[in-house]
Design a protein with these regions (language model features):
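Class I S-adenosyl-L-methionine
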Residues: 1-17, 22-103
Length: 103
C-alpha cells in the first residue's frame, strides 16, 4: 500500500516577504518539496520571488507547475490535469509537498 505525503498550501501574503506568516515560513523550511505556479513553462514565478526576497534559498528540487493565463477552457483543463497528475505522482513518493501561493 502506498503511503502518500501531505500536500500543504503556503499562502505568502500580498507580496511583501515580511508578511509571510510564521507557520508558512516554518513549512518552507520543513524539508517538504516545493511546488510553485508559473504562467508559462520556465518563466519566473511571483510566488517563488516572494520567498527569494525573504532570504530563503530555493531548494534544487523545487518544481514549477504551469497554470496558463487564458480563458480557453480546453487549455485550462489540460493544464490543471497535468498539474494534478504530477502532484499526485510526487505525493505517491511519500514526501510532503508545499504549494506556494500568493495572497
Amino acid at each position: 500500500m502506498t503511503t502518500y505525503g501531505k500536500l500543504i498550501g503556503a499562502s505568502l501574503g500580498p507580496g511583501d516577504p515580511e508578511l509571510i506568516t510564521r507557520r508558512a515560513w516554518a513549512v518552507l523550511q520543513s524539508g517538504a518539496r516545493w511546488l510553485y505556479p508559473v504562467k508559462k513553462a520556465e518563466e519566473s514565478s511571483y510566488a517563488l520571488s516572494i520567498v527569494e526576497r525573504g532570504g530563503l534559498p530555493i531548494p534544487g528540487d523545487a518544481e514549477e507547475l504551469v497554470f496558463p493565463m487564458t480563458r480557453d477552457a480546453d487549455i485550462l483543463a489540460k493544464a490543471w490535469q497535468r498539474a494534478a497528475v504530477r502532484t499526485v505522482a510526487l505525493l505517491a513518493e511519500g514526501r510532503d509537498l508545499v504549494f506556494l501561493v500568493e495572497g
